[in-house]
Amino acid sequence: MSNISKETVEKVANLAKLEVSETEATAFAGQLGKIIELVEQLNTLDTNNVEPTSHAIDVSNVLREDVATKGLDRKEVLKNAPDQQDGMFKVPTIMEQ
């Protein structure tokens, strides 16, 4: 049986930059524990005679052929830019050198 503690949930939430309340952390700990128990049940299955596969169903490419097309010209692209300089988008600096 897998035991996920409230502290583990809080640590993972912190690493993922998520805010969770005490109540949510307690609830998530129980829910995650149940999920892990269900996944652990898969380890009991005998898969010796099961052929490895990457997809459960046959997959075929349904995408169109990649064809290069003429793009927008620079003036058309920049006409709605809030700020531009030398024919390029000008954006605020976010990193110092």
Swiss-Prot record:
Annotated InterPro entries: Asp/Glu-ADT_sf_sub_c, GatC
Key words of the record: ATP-binding, Ligase, Nucleotide-binding, Protein biosynthesis
Pfam families according to UniProt: GatC
EC number: 6.3.5.-
BP GO terms, sorted: glutaminyl-tRNAGln biosynthesis via transamidation; regulation of translational fidelity; translation
Keyword Ligase annotated: yes
Gene Ontology molecular function terms on file: asparaginyl-tRNA synthase (glutamine-hydrolyzing) activity; ATP binding; glutaminyl-tRNA synthase (glutamine-hydrolyzing) activity
Keyword Ligase: yes
Transmembrane domains' residue ranges: none
Signal peptide residues on this chain, from the entry's feature table: none
Catalytic activity as recorded in UniProt: L-glutamyl-tRNA(Gln) + L-glutamine + ATP + H2O = L-glutaminyl-tRNA(Gln) + L-glutamate + ADP + phosphate + H(+); L-aspartyl-tRNA(Asn) + L-glutamine + ATP + H2O = L-asparaginyl-tRNA(Asn) + L-glutamate + ADP + phosphate + 2 H(+)
Function: Allows the formation of correctly charged Asn-tRNA(Asn) or Gln-tRNA(Gln) through the transamidation of misacylated Asp-tRNA(Asn) or Glu-tRNA(Gln) in organisms which lack either or both of asparaginyl-tRNA or glutaminyl-tRNA synthetases. The reaction takes place in the presence of glutamine and ATP through an activated phospho-Asp-tRNA(Asn) or phospho-Glu-tRNA(Gln).
Family as reported in the entry's similarity comment: Belongs to the GatC family.
Quaternary state and interactors: Heterotrimer of A, B and C subunits.
Name the UniProt record assigns to this protein: Aspartyl/glutamyl-tRNA(Asn/Gln) amidotransferase subunit C
Gene: gatC
